[in-house]
Amino acid sequence: MVLSCELTLKELLESGAHFGHQTSRWNPKMKPFIFEEKNGLYIIDLAKTLAQLKKAVSCIQKTVEQGKSILFVGTKKQAKQIIKEAAIECGEFFASERWLGGMLTNMATIRNSVKTLNNIEIDLASSNSVLTKKETALLAKRHRKLLNNLEGVRHMNSLPGLLVVIDPGYERIAVAEAGKLGIPVMALVDTNCDPTPINHVIPCNDDSIKSIRLIVNALKDAIIDTKKRSGFEILSPVRPIERPAEEIVEGLPLPNEAQNDANSKEGFLVWTDTDNSEALR
């Protein structure tokens, strides 16, 4: 069964999806998706937007049916809350605060950062902790920074099958990493962007909150419908980490004995700021 996109041209129009950038800021490669120039702005052809969106929904359906995960990427202010909420609702991964370099091309480092986050959470929750108030405060601060950057990908143990990007110009590093690894990219693309590296272009206003929400929700609904029809469980990407008991020693996980020996105090791990610096910036 092929899912259909239920959005209408009227809904796209009311969301402002047709407003492109000023004519002085356009990318000529977006010309096929432009309807006209009006008052110094390029107007996007919403008939083509709708056609591309229907193709995108079909791509989403196939990706989910194959059991592959999807990573939503949108770190600019208009997009971050929208993609976070959508990803959580449909049980997919997201990067909404900051794209960490190597999130795809150097997953081992990112996974180490996630392990550090998990370890800190266990330390903070330990009833046996002898950390001072100052040490606890420093640990809590570090936890907030790590969680802020890794919350949406902490359960992503393998590469996603598809990236859904809001504004590929703004998220060019994420797009480049996906390209290197052959991961297809679906993106909301405005008239100032280069659509060349994008596998599935959805031409639209990528600065309008209404436009972004309308289209992202259509993709989210396609994911949910496909999962329900296929019998797949919808798991929140921000669910708590479950750690086996053997990973915890005296109330604390010991991921690296040498690190523990070098940075321990009274049997408890003292986390240094030299670890996972990229995730903490």
UniProtKB/Swiss-Prot annotation:
Q: Which UniProt keywords apply?
A: Ribonucleoprotein, Ribosomal protein
Q: Which CDD domains match?
A: RPS2 (cd01425)
Top-level taxon? Bacteria
Q: GO CC terms on record? A: cytosolic small ribosomal subunit
Q: Name one GO molecular function term.
A: structural constituent of ribosome
Q: Which GO terms describe its biological process?
A: translation
Q: SUPFAM superfamilies annotated for this entry?
A: Ribosomal protein S2
- UniProt signal peptide: none
Q: Which family does it belong to?
A: Belongs to the universal ribosomal protein uS2 family.
- Tell me what this protein is called: Small ribosomal subunit protein uS2
| Species of provenance | Chlamydia muridarum (strain MoPn / Nigg)
Q: Which gene encodes it?
A: rpsB
